[in-house]
Amino acid sequence: MGQELSQHELYVEQLKKALKTRGVKVKGNDLLKFFDFVKDTCPWFPQEGTIDIKRWRRVGDCFQDYYNTFGPEKIPVTAFSYWNLIKDLIDKKEADPQVMAAVTQTEKILKVSSQTDLRDNSHNKDMDLISLESDDEEAKAPSEKMTMSNKSPKKYPAMLASQNNNTDKDPDLSEVDWDGLEDEAAKYHNPDWPPFLSRPPPYNRTAATAPAVMAVVNPKEELKEKISQLEEQIKLEELHQSLIIRLQKLKTGNERVTSSGNIESHSRTPKWPGQCLPKGKYLINKNTEEYPPKDIFPVTETMDGQGQAWRHHNGFDFTVIKELKTAVSQYGATAPYTLAIVESIADNWLTPTDWNTLVRAVLSGGDHLIWKSEFFENCRDTAKRNQQAGNGWDFDMLTGSGNYANTDAQMQYDPGLFAQIQAAATNAWRKLPVKGDPGASLTGVKQGPDEPFADFVHRLITTAGRIFGNAEAGVDYVKQLAYENANPACQAAIRPYRKKTDLTGYIRLCSDIGPSYQQGLAMAAAFSGQTVKDLLNNKNKDRGGCFKCGKKGHFAKDCRDHSNKNPESKVPGLCPRCKRGKHWANECKSKTDSQGNPLPPHQGNRDEGPAPGPEASLWGSQLCSSQQQQSISKLNRASPGSAGLDLCSTTHTVLTPEMGPQTLATGVYGPLPPNTFGLILGRGSTTVKGLQIYPGVIDNDYTGEFKIMARAISSIITIPQGERIAQLVLLPLLRTAHKIQHPYRGDKNFGSSDIFWVQPITHQKPSLVLWLDGKAFTGLIDTGADVTIIKQEDWPSHWPTTETLTNLRGIGQSNNPRQSSKYLTWKDKENNSGLIKPFVIPNLPVNLWGRDLLSQMKIMMCSPNDIVTAQMLAQGYSPGKGLGKREDGILQPIPNSGQLDRKGFGNF
C-alpha cells in the first residue's frame, strides 16, 4: 500500500509539474475529482492500462455523450478544460521529457492495477479511480469491508448497519422514472439527522491509495443494482419515521397512531400542559415539494431512531428581532400588537440568556433595566415557591447566573423550568411603562395625493388595531382621522355627508377619486388662480348677485351697469306719526299729533346708529370714542341710579403682567364741580376679567386729564378704544380751618410717593459669603474676573487639584495655575446653588468671585438714568427740599435694605 501511495503521489506531482510547464496551475484536489468523474463515465479506461491520443479521445467522446444525456448540471464545469489540457500533454509527450515521465508513470500504475483479481474488483466497483482510503481503513476485517461495500452511493445518506437489506426483484428499466427516483431519494438526504451506528469511511485526501482497477461490468446491471438500493432505502426511511411517530404516540398516552406513510415532525411533545415545545428540524413528505421552514428559535429538541433526545441551540433569526423592534418603536412596548409578538416568541424554549439578548436588542437602555429588575423580582418569587415544593429550581437557574451562566447548561433545563422562565419574562414585559402618546403614530397616518382612499383607510384601521388591540374600540377616532388626514379632494367629497354616514360611506363617496381626478383639479385650480383646497371649498358656495344690477359674477363695486346711477327719489307721504305733514317718520320732530295728544319718544337707532351688541366689545358698550377733550359734564352713567360716572379708554391698549401698573388716558379734563372731589374706582366686571384698577383721588382744583392706573393681573389683557374700565364717584369736599399756603394744583400729574429706591455705594468692597461643598468662603465680587479664584491658604489640603496649561492675567499673572479636579457645589444664604471649578493660587490676599459664578447667580448691575430723574421731578420732587406737597418730608432717600426676617427678594 505504501508503494502504491508513493507511485500515485509521484504521478500527481509529475502531472501538476507538466501542466505548470504549459503555464497552467492546478490543484491536486481538482485532479482527484476529475479522475473520479473519468472513472464514473469511462469504467473501461483504468483497465486497459494504456494512455494514448486515441484512447483519450474516446474519453472525450464519453464526456460529450454524458453531457448530451444528462445535461450540464450533472457534469463538472472543469471536466472539458482538464481533458483538453491533458490532450495537449499527450500530443507533445515525445517532445517534453517531463510529460513523458508522467504518462509512463500513469501507464505503469494502470498495468499493475489491471492484474488485480476480478473477484476483488466486484467488491470495489464503487471505489474511485484514485482511492482515498487510509491505511487504517484498508486494514479492517473483510467482514467490515463487505458491510461498507454494500452501502449506498456516496451522494445519498448512509443506512443503519443494523437494518437488513430487502432483496426485491429488479424492476423493468423501461418503466423506471429516473429523474423522479433521484429527486425522491434526494429529499431524504438531511445533513442534520442524528448520527448513525456506523459511518462511511472518512474522506482522507492526504493518505490516498493507488487507483483500484475496476472490473468490466455491464452498465445495465449496475443501474439495476443502484435502483434496487434506492428503493430499499426509501422503504426503510418511511418505516423508520413511522416507527418514531408511533413511539411518540405511545409515550404520550395517545393510542391513536397515524399511518406509516404520514411523515410528520419528530419533535418531542412537551411534558407540561400549556407549554408549546419549539419545533425542530422538519422532515419532508414524499408527496410534497415544500422545504422545511427555517428554525428561528434558540432551543430545539429532536429524537433519534433509538428514542434519545438531542437538543440544539441556534441564534435568533434577524427577521424576528426586526419585527419586534419595529413594533416597539411604532406602537410602544405594551401595545397589543407588540405583546402578541412577544407571546408568540415566548411559546418556545428560550433560555435566560436568550431573553436578556432579545430584550436588550429591542428595548431602550432604561426599559431594559426596568425589565431586568422586574424579571429578577419574578424569579425570586418563583424560586421561593420552588423551594417550598422541593423541586430544586433555584434563583440561579431561573436567571441563568452562577453555575448556570453557560448556555450549554441552560439548554438542559426541564420543560417546566422553561415554562417558569417564560412566565417571569412575559410578566416583566407587561410591567414596562407606557411612553409617549400611543395615538401619535395613528395621527401620523395620512393619505397620499394619489393614494386611493380605501387603501388609506385600510392602513388607518390596521394601525388602530395594533394600538388599541381592536379597531372597533376606536372606530369613532378612526372615522375622525379618516376625514382630517385625507387629501383635499376626498375631504371635499366627504364634507357634505360627514355627519350623515359612517366609514363605509366615506369609502363609497371617494371610490371614484383617483389620479385623473387629482390632475383635473390641479388644472382647474391653476386656471382660477386658487389652490386646490380653496377651489374645493368654494365650488359649492352660491355667490350672490350684484347689489346694483342683481347679476351674479361680480360685486357692486365692480359693477359696470350705470342704469341705476341716478335713480328717481321717492317723495314721502303723510307722516304716520304726527299725521300733520309729508315727511318721513324718522324725521318727525313733532311733540304732539294732529289731535294734540303727546307723542311717545322715538324708538329705534336714530342718529346714534345701531345699538352696540354683545359682540361689539369684550367689556361693554363703546360710550366714548372721541379723543377730544371732554369735561366732566359730558360723562354718562350706566343707569339712572348709578353712583359713578363711566370713564373709558381713549386708545387701544394691550397690557401684560410683566408691564406692571400703567396709566390709561380717558380724554376727560377737570376741574370738578365746586365743593366736590373725585374718587376713581374700578368696575366689578374688569376685576373679574383680570384687569386691576388702582383707586385714585381727583382734587377739586385739578385741571389736567383724568388718568387711570391699571395692571394686568395674570394674563394678557386687550383694552379696545372706548371701553368702560373705571368709574368716577363725586364726593362732597369738607373744608377745614387749617390753611395751606400752597398754590393750586393745576394740571400736575400724580403726586410724590415720598419713597425713592436707591442702592447705596460705599467705600467698602462688595463681599459675598458662599459655601463650596459645605465649607464657607468669603470673597470679593469681581465683575472683571472671568473665573473664580480661591487663595491657597483657604483651600482644604484634602481637596484634589490639577495643574493646568492656562495663564491667568489681571493686575498680576499666574502661569500654569492649579484648578480643582472636580466640580464643587456652591450655595448662598438663600439656598441658590450651582457648580463651578475654581482656580487655586497661592499668596492671594482675597478670594475672587468671577463671572463664571456671578452669571449662575444672575446678578445684575443697575444705575440711575434721566428717565427716572424726570419721573421724580414730575412727581413734585425739588432737589434740596423735602418730599411731599408741603415740601416738609424727608430730605434723604430711603435705602433699600430688603427683608431680613425671611428668604427671597421683595420689600412687602
Swiss-Prot record:
G-patch domain: residues covered: 864-908
Cystines in this chain: none
InterPro entries assigned: Aspartic_peptidase_AS, B_retro_matrix, B_retro_matrix_sf, dUTPase-like, dUTPase-like_sf, dUTPase_trimeric, G_patch_dom, Gag_p24_C
Keywords: Aspartyl protease, Capsid protein, Coiled coil, DNA-binding, Hydrolase, Lipoprotein, Magnesium, Metal-binding, Myristate, Nucleotide metabolism, Protease, Repeat, Viral matrix protein, Viral nucleoprotein, Virion, Zinc, Zinc-finger
Motif PPXY motif mapped to chain: 200-203
Record-annotated active site: D782
DNA-binding in keyword set: yes
Broadest EC class assigned to this enzyme: hydrolase
Keyword Ligase appears in the UniProt entry: no
Swiss-Prot/TrEMBL site (Cleavage) positions: M100, A101, M159, L160, V213, M214, F297, P298, M523, A524, F756, W757, A874, Q875
A Pfam family this chain is assigned to: zf-CCHC_5
Coiled-coil portions: 215-251
UniProt zinc finger (CCHC-type) residues: 544-561
EC id: 3.6.1.23, 3.4.23.-
UniProt motif (PTAP/PSAP motif) ranges: 208-211
Positions of the UniProt region annotated as Disordered: 132-152, 589-622, 884-908
Function noted in UniProt: Nucleocapsid protein p14: Nucleocapsid protein.
Domain statement: Gag polyprotein: Late-budding domains (L domains) are short sequence motifs essential for viral particle release. They can occur individually or in close proximity within structural proteins. They interacts with sorting cellular proteins of the multivesicular body (MVB) pathway. Most of these proteins are class E vacuolar protein sorting factors belonging to ESCRT-I, ESCRT-II or ESCRT-III complexes. Phosphorylated protein pp24 and phosphorylated protein pp18 contains one L domain: a PPXY motif which binds to the WW domains of the ubiquitin ligase NEDD4.
Protein name: Gag-Pro polyprotein
UniProt organism field: Simian retrovirus SRV-2
